[in-house]
């Protein structure tokens, strides 16, 4: 690392960015069972088991409400075709509550397979590192004390923006994990709505929303891949310009690329919901 304070500040900011980007890459390929050693998942499984009793109680409620609304009289219920339809609906809803976690993990694993395919097709095992161009470092190191004063201001602003965006990026990915846990913990309640025909749309919306949360990972990976391709060809620095102009030009273009990535990751849920018509 250079001894120059301006260069050190920029390199530290970029190091934070690269660390968060690598952490995102690791988080996206991690399963909820393995996240943070699996301790959180153990608690979520216990909560899901406890909520299942509430889901089963609601199952009966939605089933009776649906039966009353769809059947005009008790005579219709006694018809074989109606009785069979009601029995199948009840059995499916009961199975969805009992084996809901297995269903959700199966959907998650399908999406994880898609994410792995995207990574393999793009040829990326880790995101591209963002580094300062050597010519920019040389120009900054050759500056005198008074020439370095405006560079300090530019560097402080640029380094602050890069650090803030790094944390916004990682918070979004952590937020996706929290949503996965919340969906899993409370799954029996919305899944119980499959017991009644009038209420089944709630269960369908829940499954669609859960799939959307899982697919957010694919959008995040695609965003990181596109940014890595941008980072592989860093902003062009004019060696004939003064150092402060070079640094300002480099930071400006770099921040723009980072803002595009942060915006894409932040809007990953919106992009998926638009794709799925939610």
Q: Would you name each region that the model predicts?
A:
Residues 1-58:
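Binding/recognition "hotspot" determinant
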Residues 2-10, 80-100, 203-213:
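Alpha-helical transmembrane segments and their helix-start/interface "positive-inside/aromatic belt" motifs
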Residues 23-26, 82-89, 109, 116, ...:
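Short amphipathic alpha-helical coupling elements at transmembrane boundaries
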Residues 44-52, 84-88, 92, 175, ...:
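Alpha-helical membrane-interface segments at transmembrane helix boundaries
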Residues 53-65, 157, 161-163, 180:
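Hydrophobic alpha-helical transmembrane segments
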Residues 58-94, 186-200:
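Hydrophobic transmembrane alpha-helix segments characteristic of membrane transport
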Residues 94-186, 224-277:
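Non-cytosolic segments of integral membrane proteins
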Residues 191-208, 240, 271-275:
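Alpha-helical transmembrane segments
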